Amino acid sequence: MLTVPGLCWLCRMPLALSHWGICSVCARAVRQRVSLCPQCGLPAGHPSLPCGRCLQKPPPWQRLVSVSDYTPPLSLLVHQLKFTRRSEIAAALARLLLQEVLMARRSTGLPLPDRIVSVPLWSRRHWRRGFNQSDLLCQPLAHWLGCAWDSQTITRVRATATQHHLSARLRKRNLKNAFRLELPVQGLHMVIVDDVVTTGSTVAEIAQLLLRNGAATVQVWCLCRTL
């Protein structure tokens, strides 16, 4: 997707603020239009009540906030973020996520985080790519919200296989002991930030690690939640 300074990257109309990248009309258009469970982020009957899945087996986090399903046009921008390290794309996408968070906070009284953490990459993958796309989202979010962020709060201590084609049992085994907590989180309201949440297994493993170490609450914020 071509990004042109001064024009909305999606509709090509002039921007009131050229550094925003996405106009307000397109920002509203990319938002999720189906009713989602506030806890797991999957389609549900009521947007303010946990779905049947979460009532039977709740995830280890209290709230999941996403902008959209992993579909164009947002998925194209997320792909560019992941493989180009363009700071203007990161800031524009972080702003979309911030808008969703603020709307969720107004409607449900969502607590503001004390600290946000990114989903870490395995060191070899981080070295090959040169950056962690989740870090690029965390930086502006922490600045705007006035909360702490440190890319080393959680580290990935071993490589893991791709999750998409694994069963739930194998996903859990694949991620077991893959992460380590490096900073204290006792009593803190924590947020895990990722670009895309697909099965939820990775953020679940990190959420459980935070809760075992005394975090007061855990939320998950992502650009795309695969439906």
Swiss-Prot record:
CDD domains: PRTases_typeI
Name of a matching Pfam family: Pribosyltran
Family statement: Belongs to the ComF/GntX family.
PANTHER family per the UniProt record, alphabetical: DNA UTILIZATION PROTEIN YHGH (PTHR47505:SF1)
Protein task: Could be involved in gluconate metabolism.
Identification of the protein by name: DNA utilization protein YhgH
Gene name for this UniProt entry: gntX
